[in-house]
Amino acid sequence: MSNSAVAKRYAQALFELAQQKNILAEVGADLNELTKIVQESPDFLTLLNAPKFSIERKKQMVAEIFAGATPEVLHTVQLLVEKKRVNEVKLIANAYAELAAKAQGTADATVFSTRALSAEESANISTTFAKLVGKQSLNITNEIDPSLLGGIRVQIGNHIYDSSVANKLERLKRELIG
């Protein structure tokens, strides 16, 4: 079974448990923290994969390191250690985030603009495009792209909505040339 499929199964199980206990946000925050630790300290995964330590010792280390985490996340990480799938942490966190966003009616969007957007502009874009894609709200990430000349380009999942000046000029050029 591919790593992606395994990660989705773990994420689905954790998501269903978190949903039953009404702790989607807490579990998501713990998974984000775990992902951050893994990214900032690759030695952490090396330690959890090291044959030098017994599985029980590794589980004990996880319990000590993540003492403040929700029991669901703690037990999931311990299970990953036991099943030798601790390298799946990032994929599981990403899959969980997708499931939680879908359940909460949110989506991630990247807005490309020639300058940083104000909070009000981000909120307006979120409201407008959330309705367009059938979501309650969008989590906006703003990226500066001077090549747009003006306007914005919004990417939500695989969809791109381009109302940049550069795109409008390109369309006009195509219409005039042929």
Curated annotation (Swiss-Prot):
Q: What is its main location?
A: membrane
Pfam families, from UniProt? OSCP
Q: Which domain of life is it from?
A: Bacteria
| CC terms in the record's Gene Ontology section | plasma membrane; proton-transporting ATP synthase complex
Q: How does it sit in the membrane?
A: Peripheral membrane protein
Q: What GO MF annotations does this protein's record show?
A: proton-transporting ATP synthase activity, rotational mechanism
Listed under subunit, the entry gives: F-type ATPases have 2 components, F(1) - the catalytic core - and F(0) - the membrane proton channel. F(1) has five subunits: alpha(3), beta(3), gamma(1), delta(1), epsilon(1). F(0) has three main subunits: a(1), b(2) and c(10-14). The alpha and beta chains form an alternating ring which encloses part of the gamma chain. F(1) is attached to F(0) by a central stalk formed by the gamma and epsilon chains, while a peripheral stalk is formed by the delta and b chains.
Alphabetized NCBIfam families for the sequence: ATP_synt_delta, PRK05758.2-4
Q: What is this protein called?
A: ATP synthase subunit delta
This chain's source organism reads Lysinibacillus sphaericus (strain C3-41)
Q: Which gene encodes it?
A: atpH
